């Protein structure tokens, strides 16, 4: 734009100088007409350039506006999606919390019901040892089973933990450590109190005694128990060498009876001699019968 203004000013200056020069009127008119035509052409060209520039700017502005609108819509869509996801997550979490609250509403009152089961189990354990109340054991068992079934109906289940199971702190609580040769280390050797679950949540850990492994011997594997048969030799010794080889004999000791090895030696009387009588004391005592020993002649 600045260059075009300079050109217009220069053209006007030329026109002014042309008018001031003394020339013929026709030549002046022709020159003025030509100059004006040229100026009009330049002005038209400049106007066209300006219009093209304005159109280009307008088009670029429209594209920029469209891109801006598109980006704004994308940002709004993403933001709205995040808001919807967050709302859905909160609704889902709220529903889960409400469901869990309904599901585990009786968790606080479970202890009293489990204590009743513990007391019935203790009563059965001692009733089986007392013959006076042994006849009532079957009735106690019926009451206990019906109560356990009622607990199962409200989704309170007894965990199946027995001696020999591997200790697991998720479901068990070790109250004692004992030496039991029947169980390896870190294994349950006794269950003092049963554990219970409400649905999949542990409401009471099982109270167990854990073996320390002292005195436990691992059972031999089946491969070790089978006796190994010696491999047969493919080479056979020559018959002549085995026949001609002198047999080496070892001195044999007289057989002894292992049962009499720890007994003191019995001293027998020599043949053809009377047995030696013990010395008699001077103090009088009860008369003992006289026994005669018959000695057989060999």
UniProtKB/Swiss-Prot annotation:
Gene3D superfamilies, alphabetized: 3.90.20.20, Head domain of nucleotide exchange factor GrpE (2.30.22.10)
Residue ranges, compositional bias (Polar residues): 221-243
Composition bias type Low complexity, residue spans: 245-265
Keyword Cytoplasm: yes
The entry's keywords: Chaperone, Cytoplasm, Stress response
Gene Ontology molecular function terms on file: adenyl-nucleotide exchange factor activity; protein homodimerization activity; protein-folding chaperone binding; unfolded protein binding
Region feature (Disordered): 218-298
Keyword presence, GTP-binding: no
Transmembrane segments: none
InterPro entries recorded: GrpE, GrpE_coiled_coil, GrpE_head
Highest taxon of the lineage: Bacteria
GO cellular component: cytoplasm
A biological-process GO annotation: protein folding
Cellular location(s): Cytoplasm
Disulphide bridges, residue numbers: none
Leader peptide range in chain numbering: none
Entry's family note: Belongs to the GrpE family.
Oligomer status and interactors: Homodimer.
Function as written in the Swiss-Prot or TrEMBL entry: Participates actively in the response to hyperosmotic and heat shock by preventing the aggregation of stress-denatured proteins, in association with DnaK and GrpE. It is the nucleotide exchange factor for DnaK and may function as a thermosensor. Unfolded proteins bind initially to DnaJ; upon interaction with the DnaJ-bound protein, DnaK hydrolyzes its bound ATP, resulting in the formation of a stable complex. GrpE releases ADP from DnaK; ATP binding to DnaK triggers the release of the substrate protein, thus completing the reaction cycle.
Name of this protein: Protein GrpE
Species, as recorded: Mycoplasmoides gallisepticum (strain R(low / passage 15 / clone 2))
């Amino acid at each position: 734009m600045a260059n075009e203004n300079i050109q217009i000013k220069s053209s006007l200056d030329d026109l002014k100088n042309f008018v001031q020069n003394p020339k013929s009127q026709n030549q002046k008119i022709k020159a003025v007409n030509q100059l004006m035509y040229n100026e009009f052409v330049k002005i038209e060209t400049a106007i066209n350039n300006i219009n093209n520039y304005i159109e280009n700017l307008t088009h670029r502005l429209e594209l920029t506006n469209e891109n801006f609108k598109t980006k704004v819509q994308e940002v709004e869509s993403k933001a709205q999606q995040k808001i919807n996801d967050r709302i859905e997550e909160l609704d889902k979490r709220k529903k889960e919390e409400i469901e869990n609250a309904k599901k585990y509403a009786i968790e606080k009152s479970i202890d009293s019901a489990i204590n009743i089961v513990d007391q019935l189990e203790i009563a059965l354990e001692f009733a089986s040892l007392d013959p006076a109340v042994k006849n009532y054991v079957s009735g106690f068992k019926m009451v206990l089973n019906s109560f356990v079934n009622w607990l199962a109906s409200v989704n309170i289940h007894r965990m199946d933990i027995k001696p020999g199971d591997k200790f697991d702190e998720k479901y068990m609580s070790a109250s004692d450590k004992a030496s039991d040769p029947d169980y390896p280390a870190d294994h349950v050797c006794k269950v003092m109190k049963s554990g219970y679950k409400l649905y999949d949540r542990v409401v009471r850990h099982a109270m167990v005694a854990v073996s320390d492994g002292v005195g436990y011997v691992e059972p031999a594997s089946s491969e070790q128990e089978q006796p190994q048969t010696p491999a047969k030799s493919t080479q056979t010794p020559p018959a002549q060498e085995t026949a001609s080889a002198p047999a080496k004999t070892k001195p044999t000791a007289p057989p002894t009876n292992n049962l009499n090895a720890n007994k003191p030696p019995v001293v027998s009387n020599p043949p053809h001699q009377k047995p030696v009588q013990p010395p008699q004391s001077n103090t009088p005592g009860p008369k003992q019968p006289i026994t005669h020993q018959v000695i057989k002649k060999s």
